[in-house]
């Protein structure tokens, strides 16, 4: 399944919210430095969808706050 993700780095807590059918908002306490925020986004989505981190892949938007993510099963 492919989803769109809006990332809000540097927030006070880590959370994933479903906004629409294929749109999610991910808030992370991690700052966007050297890919650390992307790693945290993958970890949070992995927990949210209950799949291993290896099944989550950022397809578009590596350096953007708006990303396209592939979630495997």
From Swiss-Prot:
Pfam families found in the cross-reference section: DUF167
Gene Ontology CC annotation, any one: cytoplasm
Disulfide bonds: none
Family, per entry: Belongs to the UPF0235 family.
UniProt-listed PANTHER family: UPF0235 PROTEIN C15ORF40
NCBIfam families with a match to the protein in the record: DUF167 family protein
Name the record gives this protein: UPF0235 protein SYO3AOP1_0257
Organism, scientific name: Sulfurihydrogenibium sp. (strain YO3AOP1)
Organism phylogeny: Bacteria, Pseudomonadati, Aquificota, Aquificia, Aquificales
């Amino acid at each position: 399944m492919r989803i769109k993700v809006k990332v809000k780095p540097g927030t006070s807590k880590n959370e994933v919210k479903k906004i629409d059918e294929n749109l999610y908002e991910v808030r992370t306490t991690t700052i966007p430095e050297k890919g650390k925020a992307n790693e945290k986004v993958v970890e949070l989505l992995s927990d949210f969808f209950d799949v291993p981190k290896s099944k989550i892949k950022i397809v578009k938007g590596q350096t953007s706050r708006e990303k396209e993510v592939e979630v495997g099963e």
